[in-house]
From Swiss-Prot:
InterPro entries: ATPase_proteolipid_c-like_dom, ATPase_proteolipid_csu, ATPase_proteolipid_su_C_euk, F/V-ATP_Csub_sf. Residues 34-55, 117-128 are cytoplasmic. Proton-conducting pore forming subunit of the V0 complex of vacuolar(H+)-ATPase (V-ATPase), a multisubunit enzyme composed of a peripheral complex (V1) that hydrolyzes ATP and a membrane integral complex (V0) that translocates protons. V-ATPase is responsible for acidifying and maintaining the pH of intracellular compartments and in some cell types, is targeted to the plasma membrane, where it is responsible for acidifying the extracellular environment. GO terms for molecular function: proton-transporting ATPase activity, rotational mechanism. Residues 1-10, 77-94, 155-157 are lumenal. This is V-type proton ATPase 16 kDa proteolipid subunit c. The keyword Transport applies. Its main location: membrane. It comes from Aedes aegypti. V-ATPase is a heteromultimeric enzyme made up of two complexes: the ATP-hydrolytic V1 complex and the proton translocation V0 complex. The V1 complex consists of three catalytic AB heterodimers that form a heterohexamer, three peripheral stalks each consisting of EG heterodimers, one central rotor including subunits D and F, and the regulatory subunits C and H. The proton translocation complex V0 consists of the proton transport subunit a, a ring of proteolipid subunits c9c'', rotary subunit d, subunits e and f, and the accessory subunits VhaAC45 and ATP6AP2. It is a multi-pass membrane protein. The record marks E141 as: Essential for proton translocation.
Length: 157
């Protein structure tokens, strides 16, 4: 049985790559953000152990980045189908959605990690820096949210 030109046998491959890219790159960003800000918390908590729970916010925000990638990966994986029912166009759209959320999650995770590390160390020395750190972390988190919005918009095409 010959497949139509718009539904080649390799069409679903691009959808699978989109799902993989979504979770892999966003999880890499979340892992980096968690590790980088976690080391800052560990270094700060030696001198100021009472600030540990207050300083956990960057770690939580980094973990949310991975959830963005997970949502898109599950959406894409749920719509995968046999090559006869899955067009090349849909595969490319899903690849683009996965790359959008994945790379924006990677960038957001890097930003959260660097800001979180410096922020918790600075907050230990000057508590008034806490509000500024939170605001910068929110701006870094929104970078990942932009990727999620674009990915969901692409997915619905």
């Amino acid at each position: 049985m010959a497949l139509p030109e718009e539904n080649p046998v390799y069409g679903p491959f691009f959808g699978v790559m989109g799902a993989a890219a979504a979770i892999i790159f966003s999880a890499l960003g979340a892992a980096y953000g968690t590790a980088k800000s976690g080391t800052g918390i560990a270094a700060m908590s030696v001198m100021r152990p009472e600030l540990i729970m207050k300083s956990i916010i960057p770690v939580v925000m980094a973990g949310i980045i991975a959830i963005y990638g997970l949502v898109v990966a599950v959406l894409i994986a749920g719509s995968l189908d046999t090559p006869t029912k899955y067009s090349l166009y849909k595969g490319f759209i899903h690849l683009g959605a996965g790359l959008a959320v994945g790379f924006s999650g990677l960038a957001a995770g890097f930003a959260i990690g660097i800001v979180g590390d410096a922020g918790v160390r600075g907050t230990a020395q000057q508590p008034r820096l806490f509000v500024g750190m939170i605001l910068i972390l929110i701006f870094a988190e929104v970078l990942g949210l932009y990727g999620l919005i674009v990915a969901i918009y692409l997915y619905t095409k």
